């Protein structure tokens, strides 16, 4: 559960002290991978890296997901909420199978008294699902090939969700700690392109065999804000309000909300993990990634069971908050049909 929505820069929590650098935007529309063609007789350790390369486009061979939410051990109500809407089409050819996929994966961690957090998180998820489903529907109706929404469209959707919650606060005359709000982390998948948007401290991680576990999002909290201003991390997180949110959806109008939006290409088998802070607190995922995250990238791993085990792990070592996880597993292979020899 996120802190008091009325004063987003006061209070404390239990988060890891670390600097997070979001992954840079990319402009590719098709994932590619590079293969170096080397003559074994010419390979040497001091050889310059100027060998010819073949750039292979990649396409999805499979996309699946699993999700679960849990109230935790100390909360009476679950203020987390998530939503998944995915359309996956199998394509079979003599050269091998592939899939075309569009998916919207949303996780929100609500806050606010008198059931406000539960209402806010659900409002945000449903508003965003409807917005992006309508966006893709309009593309199909105009006979356009559905593409990943551009950053301005994603921002429009996030601000719409903020406005819906803000208007509810105003209509119900909610004040102080009763004012409802929510964090947001969202992944939008269109084949091998992924857009990530977030507000608050709910996170998205990416796991690959090459790079291991990477935190893609950067928490919107006082400590991270101070680090971006040049303050040393150890000083930034010595503040009593270091873990307090600097923005959330709902408590304030759109002038105070600026979602972070990034684009990525899937060019190798990848696992995406969306998580509320009940799962990410105390470096839990970083500490246990080898046993609880890494195995899930295998096609043989049961994602539903893996998510249940992540929830159990969080209850064992955290348990102080609601816990929610969404896992997305993307498998890719080279698109050899696009290669001309």
Predicted feature residues:
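PP2C/PPM-type serine/threonine phosphatase catalytic domain
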Residues: 1-341
């Amino acid at each position: 559960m996120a802190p008091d929505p009325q004063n987003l820069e006061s209070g404390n929590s239990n988060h890891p002290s670390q600097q997070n650098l979001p992954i840079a935007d990319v402009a590719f529309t098709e994932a590619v991978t590079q293969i170096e063609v080397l003559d074994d007789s010419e390979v040497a350790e001091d050889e310059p890296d100027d060998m010819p390369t073949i750039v292979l486009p990649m396409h999805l061979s499979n996309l699946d997901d699993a999700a679960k939410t849990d109230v935790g051990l100390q909360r009476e109500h679950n203020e987390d909420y998530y939503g998944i809407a995915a359309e996956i089409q199998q394509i079979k050819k003599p050269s091998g199978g592939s899939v075309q996929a569009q998916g919207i994966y949303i996780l929100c961690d609500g806050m606010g008294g008198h059931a406000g957090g539960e209402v806010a998180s659900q409002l945000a998820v449903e508003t965003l699902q409807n917005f992006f489903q309508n966006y893709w529907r309009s593309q199909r109706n105009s006979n356009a090939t559905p593409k990943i929404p551009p950053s301005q469209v994603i921002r429009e959707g996030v601000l719409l969700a903020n406005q819906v919650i803000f208007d509810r606060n105003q209509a119900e005359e909610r004040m102080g700690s009763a004012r409802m709000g929510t964090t947001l982390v969202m992944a939008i998948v269109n084949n091998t392109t992924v857009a990530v948007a977030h507000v608050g401290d709910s996170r998205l991680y990416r796991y690959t065999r090459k790079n291991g576990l990477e935190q893609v999002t950067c928490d919107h909290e006082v400590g991270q804000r101070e680090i971006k201003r040049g303050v040393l991390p150890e000083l930034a997180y010595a503040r009593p309000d270091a873990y307090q949110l600097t923005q959330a959806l709902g408590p304030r109008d759109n002038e105070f909300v600026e979602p972070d939006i990034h684009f990525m290409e899937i060019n190798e088998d990848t696992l995406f993990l969306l998580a509320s802070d009940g799962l990410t607190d105390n470096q839990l995922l970083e500490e246990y990634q080898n046993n609880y995250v890494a195995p899930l990238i295998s096609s043989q791993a049961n994602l539903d069971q893996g998510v249940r085990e992540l929830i159990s792990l969080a209850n064992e070592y955290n348990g102080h908050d609601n816990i929610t996880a969404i896992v997305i597993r993307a498998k890719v292979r080279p698109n050899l049909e696009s290669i001309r020899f």
